[in-house]
Design a protein with these regions (language model features):
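A structural motif detector for beta-strand N-caps
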Residues: 6, 12, 18-20, 24, ...
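Short, flexible, glycine-rich and Lys/Arg-enriched loop motifs at helix boundaries
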Residues: 65-76, 96-99
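Extreme N-terminal starter segment of soluble prokaryotic enzymes
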Residues: 1-4
């Protein structure tokens, strides 16, 4: 189910069986594969790809801009594998153009803030 109050960019690609909660934000160029659950108030930022069966809990942010003072809007990415859990208030950032431009997370992980 996709809640009526969430915001989904028109360029996002979301599998039919994904659940997206109230006030969640799905940004441009986001891909969310089957079985994912995006809870209320979670944020998935641009150029982020989520594999299958991931859960993003409330107030977590995935694919935010890098926390790097040299970052100036370059096209960077965040790639998430399958079966991960991102608990409340967790933040995962995209790579930087000066280093590795793609943050890659594998499968079967638990992230907590």
């Amino acid at each position: 189910m996709i809640h009526e109050t969430c915001q989904i960019h028109s360029s996002a690609s979301i599998s039919d069986d994904v659940d997206i909660g109230a006030y969640a934000i799905i940004d441009r160029n986001v891909t969310i594969d089957s079985g994912c659950i995006i809870k209320n108030h979670a944020v998935i930022r641009e150029n982020t790809s989520l594999g299958k069966n991931n859960t993003v809990y409330q107030f977590a942010t995935i694919g935010e801009e890098p926390q790097d003072l040299k970052f100036s809007g370059e096209d960077t990415k965040c790639t998430i594998g399958d079966n991960n859990k991102f608990r409340e208030y967790c933040s995962i950032h995209r790579g930087t153009s000066k280093g590795i431009s793609n943050t890659i997370i594998g499968n079967n992980n638990l992230f907590m803030a």
